[in-house]
Amino acid sequence: MSLNNVPAGKSLPDDLYVVIEIPANADPIKYEVDKESGAVFVDRFMSAPMFYPCNYGYVNHTLSLDGDPVDVLVPTPYPLMPGSVIRCRPVGVLKMTDESGEDAKVVAVPHSKLSKEYDHIQDVNDLPELLKAQITHFFERYKELESGKWVKVDGWEDVEAARKEILDSYQRAQNK
């Protein structure tokens, strides 16, 4: 089955399906799911010896301003396998700019049907401060050793901003 058949979610923007590309704490390898075949490709070996602080993936049938689907970070108690799909709800967004332009990262937690562990997290301010600091630190530095690449973290925004990011990106993809 192609991952293209996975819907964006059950009820956007609050009930998403996130396709995982990179597990939390995995080796510094950037994987990307090929949208046509559904295969997980090695995009590059990261120059900085850093680990993604959360599972990293995307929402199908969305189109961000950078031309890719919406990027999503998913904290979980265990790393998720690349190519797996997890049901989530958004809680915030890390606004960033890189060499290609605006590059927001939505943060979403597992749906309560998967785990009650995240039920108390309703907004980005409910996330542990250490986790937010780790995410910020990672994205400020993960491209530092790659020639011609850079990142500027613009800051955290709330659940409403995350919902808007998802809905705008979904609408953009539908109008494409």
UniProtKB/Swiss-Prot annotation:
InterPro entries: Pyrophosphatase (IPR008162), Pyrophosphatase_sf (IPR036649). It catalyses: diphosphate + H2O = 2 phosphate + H(+). One of its GO terms (molecular function) is inorganic diphosphate phosphatase activity. Mg(2+) 2 binds at D71. It is an enzyme of class 3 (hydrolase). Mg(2+) 1 binds at D66, D71, D103. It is found in: Cytoplasm. Its cofactor is Mg(2+). Disulfide bonds: none annotated. It comes from the Bacteria. Its EC number is 3.6.1.1. It holds the Pfam family Pyrophosphatase. One of its GO terms (cellular component) is cytoplasm. One of its GO terms (biological process) is phosphate-containing compound metabolic process. Substrate binds at K30, R44, Y56, Y142. Catalyzes the hydrolysis of inorganic pyrophosphate (PPi) forming two phosphate ions. NCBIfam families: PRK01250.1. Belongs to the PPase family. Homohexamer. This is Inorganic pyrophosphatase. It comes from Vibrio vulnificus (strain YJ016). The gene is ppa.
